[in-house]
Structures are given as structure tokens and as C-alpha cells.
């Protein structure tokens, strides 16, 4: 697990999740789906009040690099036993810079 931060912008403003995290395997489809698992995380913003959400834009900060997130649909789910949260992002179009760890 490494430091991971995702910032998402939607109609409710900017929301973030940050902490220790890593990408999870995702199907090889185009445009890509990004799936991340966070532990020891913190959330900020209104987006986390809903389990499903629309994203206008965003960015991933991972291993010293930044990757854009284009318009997308997202979901999240919490695993109370492992004290973890999984974030799934279904991109509507390809990003300018692909996240290579997925």
C-alpha cells in the first residue's frame, strides 16, 4: 500500500479520499474502469453521502504522479471487516494520461 489520493468534482463540489491504497484488478475494456482499495483513509466532501455518483472531472495522485479523470460514473462500497473502502470509476471517455497501475 502506498499513499493514494483521488479528487473528484461533481455537482456537489469537490470531494476527496486519501490514505493508504492500491489499484485492484479491473476488466480490460475501453475506456478503462479504475478500481481502488483504501485503508487508513479520510474522506472530505458531499460525494461520500451517496453510493453512486456522476463525476465531471478529477485526478488521481499515486506514486508521485498525477492522472486525470474525465467525466465518469462512480460507486463506492465499504468493507467493515477489513476497515477498507473500494472506489470504482467507470470512465465515459479515455483520459489524456492513462493510469498504468490498473
UniProtKB/Swiss-Prot annotation:
Coiled coil: none annotated. It comes from the Eukaryota. Keywords: Cell adhesion, Glycoprotein. InterPro entries: Dicty_CAD (IPR008601). O-glycosylated. The keyword Glycoprotein applies. It is found in: Cell surface. GO terms for cellular component: cell surface. One of its GO terms (biological process) is DNA damage response. The keyword Glycoprotein applies. The lineage of its organism: Eukaryota, Amoebozoa, Evosea, Eumycetozoa, Dictyostelia. Cell-cell adhesion during early development. It holds the Pfam family Dicty_CAD. Belongs to the csb family. This is Glycoprotein 24A. It comes from Dictyostelium discoideum.
Amino acid at each position: 500500500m502506498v499513499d493514494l489520493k483521488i479528487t473528484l468534482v461533481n455537482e456537489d463540489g469537490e470531494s476527496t479520499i486519501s490514505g493508504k491504497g492500491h489499484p485492484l484488478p479491473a476488466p480490460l475494456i475501453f475506456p478503462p474502469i479504475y478500481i481502488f482499495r483504501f485503508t487508513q483513509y479520510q474522506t472530505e466532501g458531499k460525494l461520500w453521502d451517496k453510493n453512486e455518483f456522476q463525476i465531471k472531472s478529477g485526478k488521481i495522485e499515486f506514486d508521485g504522479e498525477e492522472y486525470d479523470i474525465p467525466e465518469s460514473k462512480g460507486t463506492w462500497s465499504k468493507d467493515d471487516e477489513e476497515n477498507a473502502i473500494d472506489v470504482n470509476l467507470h470512465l465515459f471517455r479515455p483520459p489524456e494520461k492513462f493510469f498504468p497501475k490498473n
